[in-house]
Amino acid sequence: MGKIIGIDLGTTNSCVAVMEGSEAVVIPNSEGKRTTPSIVAFLENGERKVGDPAKRQAITNPTNTISSIKRFMGKKFSESKSEADRATYKLEAGSNDTPRVRIADRQYTPQELSAMILQKMKTTAEEYLGHEVKEAVITVPAYFNDAERQATKEAGQIAGLEVKRIINEPTAAALAYGMDKKGKDMTVAVFDLGGGTFDVSVLELGDGVFEVKSTNGDVHLGGDNFDEVIIDWLAGEFKSEEGLDLRQDPMALQRLKEAAEKAKIELSSSASTEINLPYIMPVNGMPKHLVKTLTRAKFEQLADSLIKRTLDPCKQALKDAGLSIGQIDEVILVGGSTRIPRIQEEVEKFFGKKPSKGVNPDEVVALGAAIQGGVLTGEVTDVLLLDVIPLSLGIETMGGVFTKLIEANTTIPSKKSEVFSTASDNQPSVEIHVLQGERAFAKDNRSIGRFHLGDIPPAPRNVPQIEVTFDIDANGILNVSAKDKGTGKEQKIRIEASSGLSADEIERMRNEAKANEGKDREEKEKIEKINQADSMIFQTEKQLKEFGDKLSAGNKSAIEASLEDLKKAFEAKDISAIDTAMAAINTAWQAASQEMYSAEQGAGQPGADAGQSGPSDSVTDVEFEEVDGDKK
């Protein structure tokens, strides 16, 4: 069985890990970094960049650079409009009210864009392992609903990965944290504040069993929001001074975003930071600069409401787990945003203990995913992971009431059946409206699917017996069936993401992604070849200066002619011509080297001017110093 890689598909950064023996290890990307920015960029020449190369060009190409796409996974456009309005790229409504990113004349779904990031992770792992990778465990925020989980699975399929398991980020973190503590029984709280989402989970660890007792969170709270309060402050300051809103200009907004993120990071270790953005925007034909000093105290004041929003989910998670604060043995911080000092202070104050510093908050989730991959392949034994669903699942019943079949924080996988009936006499069919949430009425919860069970024989109301079964798998993805117990007729539905992507669409996107993967590989090979040519030009010119006077006119002329050909091929970026010219230079140098070697051999033969007939009999005195034993 091949390796199953673990991928933390993050809002801001992504990370990939794999089991090596009994250890999970993070795999560095092609830039040598252990995490990869979750950013995709499209260039005017049709080239696509992912990760650090995409991030580096964002300021000059803001409308075609996509970041934080995870915030739109499995969402409806109408429910994410406020977030869409803050993006530098253009989001518009697609079919079924799904968000689509407009790039030139093409629309991309969040799944397609996430797949490009997953492809980068897949390629990173393949280059490290030296073989193709086909399977992965991918993490999601614990509070992701069914549609968001399904969308993540679709992204994996488009990227050419078989997603063996979707697991919750805090659970993955606890798995990585607790692997070397198998002999110790403990209750841990995982406080996970990432780039776009916040989760808190309470788990019991003991004898290799990792049991999630409860989970809670907010999928609209993360590091991006902390950046936004700085952006709004900077834009507000500039507007009050100059009368212009920088957020209306995509390039200026992108510069604000990068400056805000940098300032936030610096304030984790400094009391203040200077934000200096020269030539941010012309006002009345005059270039204007934005120079501001932001103190940590001011940042904490701006972010105060965001910080307080993390505490209610902590209270609810403890309540749902039936535990008091004093029963929590360890608090684990996950996600880059937990580096904010005020967050650490509030967590310590709430739980009454210092959070554990034993894990890297940027890497621990991917490590946990890799461990889960190891469990599935059998590389990791004696580990049992018991996760839960974050939100209740049920159906709409008479009067618009939401009737729960599977309660929140139920251990998965899980299966539950309940019998319902018709609401009117001789009702020929029933509509099963599947929902997810905690509110009493259907209209206040999230609709995740509908289907019909027809051909019900005529009968008075409440007589037909319709058995509805909810079956939720280990990925937290739901299958629903409805069966008329009288006739045995059954209808099933696998709840698909509200993305509305059909199997054909997913297959089409997967084929496109595969084609692009080949194109990306070719582009990379082309760049490497061009770099080799550049290096050979430099080395050849250097060697001609050094050894030119030792070469015969013929050999020197051959090298110079081949060098000229290589320069022309390099300028034209003609790979075939580069290969030919490089081969010609190598051949010419081989001939020249042979000539120089023969000349040197001839100079050292008997009969040379030195008149020596053998090794010299003379002895040269050298100084000798005995080394003291202590210095050895």
From Swiss-Prot:
It comes from Cytophaga hutchinsonii (strain ATCC 33406 / DSM 1761 / CIP 103989 / NBRC 15051 / NCIMB 9469 / D465). Keywords: ATP-binding, Chaperone, Nucleotide-binding, Phosphoprotein, Stress response. The keyword Nucleotide-binding applies. Coiled coil: none annotated. SUPFAM superfamilies: Actin-like ATPase domain (SSF53067), Heat shock protein 70kD (HSP70), peptide-binding domain (SSF100920). Induction: By stress conditions e.g. heat shock. This is Chaperone protein DnaK. NCBIfam families: PRK00290.1, PRK05183.1, prok_dnaK. Pfam families: HSP70. The modification Phosphothreonine is found at residue 197.
